[in-house]
Amino acid sequence: MIDSEIRAVFFDAVGTLLFPRTPVSRTYAEHGSRHGSNVTEDQVQLAFREAFARQEVADEAAGWRTDEARERARWRAIVADALPGANSDACFPGLWEWFSTPAAWVVPSDVRLVLRSLADRGLVVGVASNFDSRLFRLVDSFPELAPVRGRCVISSLVGWRKPARQFFDALVEAAGCERGRVLYVGDDVRNDLHGATAAGLRAVLLDPAAETLGPNRIRRLRDLIAG
């Protein structure tokens, strides 16, 4: 599926290479219950989506600028909104730390195969994500992610969140080749597919629920190395 013009392949992290081991809403509800919140998992799920969307609106209004402090602040706000009644000063640090540990995450079985296959072809591989410096710990903790170590483009460190062009400019610099020869793979239509293509990169959307497939849409990560 990857044509001969491609020289580098970068991946989104959460929802592409990394997935929460248990539903985020369940983890939040369990942590919240220890700190004064009595909301159900379903209530947390709805409140989390709404809180996350509000933070996206705020980030867009700020031109997608970010840093380590902003990422921590946005997640503190999300936790407070998703867990009404909880003592957020007590609850937030535990959740922040939990999601920095490999115990909170799982890497799908095909990730090792795909990353190794691409690296063996001589392609530059890396990860580029809206995340913070906790991602380094996660990448270092999973043997499956070894091929992307040393090429981590993280929004809080480059100063811009996807879908900002500046984020993808930093990705291209890390790739070390022309932007038209960089392929970006992710699961979000606006941030990953549209953001990358608007910046002049090639892009593929990972969409397990896709009814139809095409050159820019796959259901499984291993489809990248098929054919």
Residue ranges: model-predicted function:
Residues 2-113, 121:
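N-terminal helical cap/lid subdomain that shapes the substrate entry/recognition surface
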Residues 1-9, 19, 88-92, 106, ...:
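Asp-based, Mg2+/Mn2+-dependent phosphohydrolase catalytic module
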